[in-house]
Structure formats: structure tokens, C-alpha cells
Amino acid sequence: MIKVKSPGRVNLIGEHTDYTYGYVMPMAINLYTKIEAEKHGEVILYSEHFGEERKFSLNDLRKENSWIDYVKGIFWVLKESDYEVGGIKGRVSGNLPLGAGLSSSASFEVGILETLDKLYNLKLDSLSKVLLAKKAENEFVGVPCGILDQFAVVFGREGNVIFLDTHTLDYEYIPFPKDVSILVFYTGVRRELASSEYAERKHIAEESLKILGKGSSKEVREGELSKLPPLHRKFFGYIVRENARVLEVRDALKEGNVEEVGKILTTAHWDLAKNYEVSCKELDFFVERALKLGAYGARLTGAGFGGSAIALVDKEDAETIGEEILREYLKRFPWKARHFIVEPSDGVGI
């Protein structure tokens, strides 16, 4: 029996840039998917969250449109890549909320991959884990995500954010201020629109790159956007500005300038809301209230359309600010919201 802890992730800055090979700045966080498992002839897993057991044989990898597809996807991708593994029997638990924009799917997939790697001695290196988990989500589960989530879950390092160029996969660890916490606010709004709207934005972004003849959004300057049709210009303009903001946050963090980091995050949120059109009134409410209560900055994190937002706050004030916003939020909105105080943490491991 082995026990694996696979973290969720928060993206500090660089939202909706990874599918055009731009810059991102995620971190693994101290909320986890936990998997306890042993070798077995089949796959038998009990999910605490769903309160049910699912099982399948290794020669039946048909999709079931349930949480077990994330597991099947990992077995499928290993088979596709000529790795030989047997089954597992075990239990999935943890404190990482599902559907909250904190990459529970990537956390789960990478956790299953790590479990199989250790049980069957696959000797996978870190980048292979990232690429295999991404392929499983893209090609088996059918979610057209970029590389950000899996990279953060695998490469996370305690006390650091990751500055990642998703084009070259060059990365750099940047220390996060020790006296600052990240307040994560889950709005309770399920992201029903996210899959179709996300796919539309990804399609428009990819078309924009083709029109401009570029391999990455990093190569595009604001002056070139006039070559694009109006909606493409609006959406892709956001991506170009967001790439620049990631570089600005990198520099501000290195200088220890938390105030500047906060301002950039807030600017990013309103650009996401007004020009990329992926916010909602609940996310905007959190950002406005967090700033009024003393946050350095705040923005939605993840795909948007609900899910979660983050605020940078002094560690000593984090819980108070979180409780106050939650109290006001619950008076105004009918959703079951929650808040978490998180810190940059290590990636997947035993």
C-alpha cells in the first residue's frame, strides 16, 4: 500500500495564455487529492467525495462519463505510450474541492499517474508525468486544457511560484513573500459555461495566431492586433497584455514589491472581465470587497465563469478578510461559497 499526495494549483497570473504558448505563473497549493492504493488485477477505487466505488478491467477503457474517466485516461495514455502496468485497488480522498477552479482534475490525474509510477516502477521523469497527464485530459477525457495545471501539480515547490514559458517549457522558481497569504474564495458558482466558452476562446486564439503567422502569443505586439477581426482583436489583445503582465509580476516579486504585484493582478482581473468576458458578478464582488478590506490585489483564477478568485493579503489578516467577505457574500448570493488560505507548496509525491 502506498499513499500519494497530489496538490491543487492556483495560477497567480497568466490566465488563458497557455493554449497560445504564452507565459504563466502557477503554484502548487496545500490542498490535496490523496490516493491510497495497492497492486491488484483490476482497478477498484472508492471515492470519498462521490461516496461510491467504481471498478473496471484493464482491457475495458471505454469512457463512462463519470469521475472514473480520469483514471481510465491515465491507464489509456500509459498503454498508448507502451508502459506496462497492472491494476490498483484503493481509496481517493482529500481536501481539494472539485469544480472550484483549483485543478482538481489535474491533481487527480497526476496523483493516479504517480501511484502507478511508484507501484509499478515506471521511472517516469517529471516532464513525462506532465505530458502524459495532459494528453490523458486532452485526448481521453476530452478537455482542451493547456499545460499549466499539470506542470504546477508536478513541479510545485514549497514557498515558490513557477515562472513558466509554455512554449519552450523553460521555467524558474521565484520565492513568494513569506508574510503574504493567498486567500482563495470559491464562489460556489459551478462553471456550466466553462467548457463551451473555453473551447470558443481557445479556437479564436489559435485562429489569431494563424492569421498573424506566429507560433506563440509571446511574439505578438499590440500594434499587430489591427490585422485581426474585431472579436479576435478583443480576445487576443487580452492575451498579449497578460503575457506582459506575467513578466511584470516576475520582476516585482524579485524586487519584493508586493504592492505592485497586487496592482497588476487587479488590472488583470478587469481585463479578463471586460475584454475576455470570462468573469461573473460573484467573482467581481469578491475582487471589489477584497480590495476594500485591504488586499494588495485580487483576480479570478482558472478558466472563469464562476469557480474561484484569489486575493493577496497580509498573513495576519487573511482569515479575518476571508470571513468578512464570506459573510457579506452569503447575504447577497444563494451559492455555497467557501474560502481557503493557501501557500505555495511542493508538487506531487509520497
Curated annotation (Swiss-Prot):
Q: Which positions form S-S bridges?
A: none
Gene Ontology CC: cytosol
EC assignment: the record states 2.7.1.6
The Swiss-Prot or TrEMBL record describes its family as follows:
Belongs to the GHMP kinase family. GalK subfamily.
State the encoding gene: galK
- Protein name stated in the entry: Galactokinase
Q: Which residues bind ATP?
A: 47, 99-105
Name any one GO molecular function: ATP binding
Where, by residue number, does substrate bind? 15-18, 198
Localization annotation: Cytoplasm
Signal peptide as annotated in the record: none
Annotated Gene3D superfamilies: 3.30.230.10, GHMP kinase, C-terminal domain
